[in-house]
C-alpha cells in the first residue's frame, strides 16, 4: 500500500471541512430533472393554446425563522423554493419566465442561500425556464411591453386554494367558507385577491381557472413521484409500527405520536403530511381527532392515522390495534371483517374499472363472507351489513397532499393513480369505530398495495405489539405502565 503523506491528509481534511464539501445544495430539490419540469410546463402550453398565458403564484414568505414550504403546484412546475415567486407561461411563444424577489443578504447570512433574481443564470440551469427576472418586471410583461405583443386575450391562473403544508384543498375550502361567514373577518382567499388585482390592473384579460388542468396532471403520478410516495409510505408504516411496539395501558396518545415522529425525522421527513389522528377507545369515533391528550386504557382499541411530509409528497396509512396487545372475541370479529373487506376491495382494482364497480364487486364478496357468520351483538351484525352500502370505503387520491387533487371516483382507473382504500364500520351505541387504510397504486396489470408491509393480520399485529418500542427504551417523565 502506498504511504499517505501528511500533506495529502491535510488537504483532505481541508476539503471535507470546506462549506462546498460539507453542505448539500439545500436551496434546490434533487428528485426531479429539468426535463421533468419542462414536460409538465409543456402540458400547460398544449392545453392553453397560442392565444393565452398562464400565471402561477408561489407561496408567500413566512414570518419568523420558519422553514419555507412552497405551494404544491408551483413546486410541481418549477422545483423552486423561494417565497413570493411567480411563473409566467406565454402560450404565444411557449416561453416560461420565473419572477423572483431580489436577494436578501442579511437573511441569507443567517439562514442560508435562497434562490433570487440575482441567481438568474443558476435558476435557468436548475429549472430549464427560459428567463428569470426580478419580481417588479411582471406587471410590465403582462401589459404586452415585452413578452406579449399583441397582448394575449386569456389569462389562466389557479383559482382553487393551493396547499402549502399539512392542509389539503378540501380543508382549505372549508376554512375559507368559515372566514367568509365571519362578519368581523370575511377576508377573500389569496387566489381571489390575485384575480381581483388582475381584473383591476389588466382588464384586457379574460381570466380562467388553471386548477382543473393542474389537478388532472397531478392525478397521474410519474415513476419518480411513485418512488417518493413509496418512500413516504414506508416511513409512515415504520412510524405506525413503532407506535404499535410502544403501546401498553397507561401510555398517552401523544406518546405514540412522538414515537412515530422520531421515525419520520430519522428517515428524512420535513414534518407531518397531515396532523396525526391517534385515538384510544371512544376517541377513535371522532374521524379527525387530533387532541392526543388521553392515556390508553386496558381493553380498548387505539386507532392511528399518520404519514410524513417527505420531499413534498405524503402517504395515508391507518391501523387499529388492542392497547393490551390482544384482541378480545368481539373486537376480533369486527376487525377480521374489516381486513377481509380491505382484501376484497383490492381484489377488483385494475385499469379501466370505476370505483363503483370495485365497491359493488367487493360488497358482493362480503355478503358471501357474512353467510353463516355471527357477531357478539345484533348491533355489530347490523353495522357490518349497513356498511356494505357505504361508498366511502374507496377514498381519495394521495400525492403532494394527503387528500390530493383530482378525481378517482366516477372515472375509469388509470395506471399511475394513487389513492386510499379505507374500509370502516360504526357501532353508534358504543361509540365504537373500526377502520384500516391502505395506499393503492394502479399498475398496468392491476394494483399494488403500497402499505401491505404494515401489519394488519391479527397474528402480525399482536406479535408487533409484543416487541419493545421507543417508549420502553426512553421512558418519558409521564412514565407509562411497563409491559
What are these regions (language model features)?
Residues 1-9:
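Bacterial N-terminal signal peptides that target proteins for export
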Residues 2, 20-483:
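Active-site neighborhoods and metal-handling regions in enzymes and metal-associated proteins
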Residues 9-18:
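Bacterial N-terminal signal peptides
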Amino acid at each position: 500500500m502506498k504511504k499517505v503523506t501528511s500533506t495529502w491528509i491535510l488537504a483532505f481534511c481541508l476539503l471535507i471541512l470546506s462549506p462546498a464539501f460539507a453542505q448539500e445544495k439545500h436551496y434546490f430539490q434533487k428528485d426531479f430533472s429539468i426535463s421533468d419540469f419542462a414536460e409538465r410546463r409543456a402540458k400547460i402550453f398544449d392545453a392553453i393554446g397560442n392565444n393565452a398565458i398562464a400565471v402561477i403564484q408561489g407561496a408567500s414568505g413566512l414570518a419568523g425563522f420558519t422553514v419555507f414550504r412552497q405551494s404544491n403546484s408551483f413546486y410541481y412546475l418549477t422545483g423552486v423554493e423561494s417565497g413570493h415567486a411567480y411563473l409566467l407561461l406565454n402560450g404565444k411563444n411557449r416561453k416560461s419566465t420565473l419572477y423572483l424577489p431580489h436577494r436578501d443578504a442579511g437573511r441569507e447570512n443567517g439562514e442560508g442561500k435562497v434562490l433570487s433574481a440575482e441567481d438568474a443564470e443558476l435558476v435557468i440551469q436548475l429549472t430549464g425556464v427560459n428567463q428569470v427576472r426580478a419580481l417588479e418586471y411582471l406587471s410590465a410583461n403582462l401589459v404586452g411591453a415585452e413578452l406579449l405583443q399583441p397582448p394575449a386575450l386569456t389569462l389562466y391562473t389557479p383559482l382553487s386554494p393551493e396547499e402549502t403544508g399539512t392542509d389539503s384543498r378540501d380543508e382549505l375550502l372549508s376554512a375559507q367558507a368559515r372566514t367568509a361567514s365571519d362578519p368581523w373577518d370575511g377576508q377573500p382567499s389569496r387566489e381571489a385577491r390575485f384575480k381581483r388585482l388582475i381584473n383591476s390592473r389588466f382588464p384586457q384579460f379574460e381570466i380562467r381557472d388553471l386548477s382543473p388542468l393542474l389537478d388532472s396532471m397531478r392525478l397521474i403520478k410519474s415513476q419518480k413521484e411513485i418512488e417518493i410516495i413509496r418512500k413516504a409510505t414506508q416511513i409512515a408504516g415504520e412510524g405506525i409500527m413503532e407506535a404499535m411496539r410502544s403501546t401498553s395501558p397507561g401510555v398517552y396518545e401523544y406518546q405514540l405520536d412522538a414515537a412515530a415522529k422520531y421515525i419520520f425525522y430519522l428517515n428524512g421527513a420535513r414534518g407531518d403530511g397531515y396532523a396525526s389522528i391517534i385515538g384510544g377507545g371512544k376517541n377513535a369515533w371522532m374521524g379527525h381527532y387530533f387532541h392526543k391528550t388521553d392515556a390508553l386504557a386496558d381493553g380498548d382499541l387505539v386507532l392511528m392515522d399518520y404519514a410524513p411530509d417527505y420531499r413534498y409528497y405524503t402517504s395515508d396509512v391507518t391501523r387499529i390495534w388492542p392497547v393490551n396487545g390482544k384482541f378480545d372475541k368481539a373486537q376480533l370479529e369486527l376487525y377480521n371483517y374489516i381486513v377481509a373487506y380491505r382484501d376484497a376491495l383490492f381484489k377488483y382494482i385494475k385499469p379501466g374499472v370505476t370505483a363503483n364497480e370495485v365497491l359493488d364487486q367487493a360488497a358482493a364478496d362480503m355478503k358471501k363472507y357474512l353467510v353463516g357468520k355471527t357477531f357478539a351483538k345484533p348491533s355489530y351484525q347490523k353495522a357490518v351489513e349497513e356498511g356494505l352500502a357505504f361508498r366511502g370505503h374507496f377514498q381519495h387520491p394521495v400525492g403532494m397532499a394527503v387528500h390530493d387533487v383530482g378525481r378517482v371516483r366516477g372515472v375509469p382507473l388509470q395506471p399511475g393513480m394513487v389513492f386510499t382504500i379505507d374500509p370502516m364500520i360504526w357501532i353508534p351505541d358504543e361509540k365504537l369505530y373500526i377502520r384500516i387504510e391502505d395506499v393503492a397504486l394502479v399498475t398496468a396489470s392491476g394494483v399494488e398495495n403500497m402499505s401491505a408491509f404494515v401489519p394488519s393480520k391479527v397474528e402480525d399485529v399482536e406479535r408487533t405489539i409484543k416487541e419493545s418500542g421507543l417508549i420502553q427504551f426512553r421512558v418519558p417523565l409521564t412514565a407509562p405502565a411497563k409491559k
